[in-house]
Amino acid sequence: MAQNDRYNEETISQAINTKWAGKTVHFAKETDSTNSWIKRLAKEGAEHGTLAVAEFQSAGRGRFDRKWEAPEGSSIMMTLLLRPEFSPQYASMLTLVMGLAVAQAVEELGFEVSIKWPNDVVISRKKICGILTEMGTNGVKINYVLIGVGINVNFKEFPEEMQDKATSLILESGQEYDRNQVISLVM
């Protein structure tokens, strides 16, 4: 972990300076997946802008239920809960909005990035971030939208089958990053 990478509810909350996104932060050392966790919170009435962050996910997943794994302390695993007041047909744009937020954050750290349609952020043609958006509706109205984000920050070694497809901030720069800072830039 980066020097002084204290990573908990308090440090994440202190790093975020927004009007509403991430004003309420839930942090866990381990969860099944941040999307599944915040979906449970949404059904219990969690408010718009609630952020769930985990150090480790035992059942992290991406699009098409692909398994997503990262060693503890290596990545950002978070999900933002939204309760938008527009038709479900427009919800897909939220994936792109989050992709743009991540891309801008990583650019602020000095990297050249691009967005690979529909849900990946890449550096040097390798994936650094994946986004999984899920929605709950009553058919006509959105009850909640969950935007899950996985960013490879201090991930030092990928499995051989992923080495030509994935990268991390530390692999691209040779330096470790404070995940609190990266979250604050994204939010």
Model-derived segments and spans:
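Catalytic beta-strand/loop module used to bind and position nucleotide/cofactor moieties
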Residues: 48, 55-56, 69-75, 79-187
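N-terminal lobe of the biotin/lipoate ligase/transferase fold
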Residues: 1-104, 129
